[in-house]
Amino acid sequence: MINNVVLVGRMTKDAELRYTPSQVAVATFTLAVNRTFKSQNGEREADFINCVIWRQPAENLANWAKKGALIGITGRIQTRNYENQQGQRVYVTEVVADNFQMLESRATREGGSTGSFNGGFNNNTSSSNSYSAPAQQTPNFGRDDSPFGNSNPMDISDDDLPF
């Protein structure tokens, strides 16, 4: 079975950082993710996805990613249920993020000058914070051109083919 989620979106508010009784950090947040299509009135709609992240990445997210931050997360979808104070069963579906990455600098997000920092932090449970280099733009060396565009057709009969 495969249960993988990759999301890129903006945080709708600062993450809520809490600690379990055994002092394990857990942060909850909502990510606004644009849909790939526009509505009938021409506007792009967004989905608001509830997420949770645990341990050191939770503390890092709460410290570094604030409301409006563009982040990428990887994780899985999880469902759970509990009984509320009125005795009703409540079902919750959320994304459990394994790690996150800041996708823009604070200066860019706040409308300031664009700094030289265009990468982010990759915060997973198996390593400490590490800088991710910005993606490099590779030139298109005629990749869209047909490699056979200037050649003549080949004279091949069906008898020449091995199948």
From Swiss-Prot:
Every copy of the SSB domain together lies at 1-104
Can you say what this protein is called? Single-stranded DNA-binding protein 2
Supply the Gene3D superfamilies for this chain: Nucleic acid-binding proteins (2.40.50.140)
GO cellular component terms attached to this protein's record: nucleoid
- Outline what the protein does: Plays an important role in DNA replication, recombination and repair. Binds to ssDNA and to an array of partner proteins to recruit them to their sites of action during DNA metabolism.
Residue numbers spanned by region Disordered: 109-163
Please indicate which superkingdom the organism of origin belongs to.
Bacteria
Organism phylogeny: Bacteria, Bacillati, Bacillota, Bacilli, Lactobacillales
What positions carry the motif Important for interaction with partner proteins? 158-163
Q: Which InterPro entries did the record assign?
A: NA-bd_OB-fold, Primosome_PriB/ssb, ssDNA-bd
Q: Name one Pfam family in it.
A: SSB
State the organism of origin: Streptococcus pyogenes serotype M18 (strain MGAS8232)
Q: Which gene encodes it?
A: ssb2
Tell me which Gene Ontology terms the entry assigns under biological process: DNA recombination; DNA repair; DNA replication
Polar residues: compositionally biased ranges: 131-140
Q: What does the subunit comment say?
A: Homotetramer.
- What Gene Ontology molecular function terms does this protein carry? single-stranded DNA binding
Q: Which UniProt keywords apply?
A: DNA damage, DNA recombination, DNA repair, DNA replication, DNA-binding
Residue ranges with Low complexity bias? 119-130
